[in-house]
Amino acid sequence: MTSDLEQKWNQRYAEADPAAATPCAVLEQFAHLLPPDGAALDVACGLGGNASLLAGRGLVTRAWDRSPVGIAKLREHAEEHGLPIRAEVRDVEREPPDPGAFDVIVVSYFLERALAPALATALRPGGLLFYQTWTREAVDDRGPGNPDFRLAPNELLELFPDLRLLAYREEGLFGDPAEGLRNEAWLVGARPPA
């Protein structure tokens, strides 16, 4: 049986074009940190904007989402463009990644706090986590209405205490709310080398 959440995302993706899917800003801005090869995972991938960037940079990429519609469209897009993406319908909350399985993990606009330890341990030594999601401090109504799906100030840092911090950005409500990064937090962290 299809859940309400799955139905919501299936409807959204049914009308969408995967060619228009773009990578999240934190991944684009810090793509220079990516390794030249290795295994990557795009969590809650949607139409695969992050997965496409990762695969295009030479990483063997897996993309997981609970929407069969989104995954079908991503598979078709990857095949048409010769991208090494293995797109799978998978509920990452029930089936988290295996420990030490990935060199890169990207999460954008998805928040399941209980999954944070599994994401950190799924990184290989020296592996990178790129994370971008909504914050409770917001200047407009973009993002989810439920505060459970938004981060408290500095919470993203607290969710990944064992990673080496390479980049972090969260501007909250400081300064001119019409400028800068608003409504979101970004993190790039690395699992320490063995």
Predicted segments with their positions:
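Conserved class I S-adenosyl-L-methionine
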Residues: M1-P35, D37-G46
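A short, conserved alpha-helix within the catalytic core of class I
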Residues: L111-T121
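Conserved beta-strand signature within the Rossmann-like core of class I S-adenosyl-L-methionine
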Residues: G127-W134
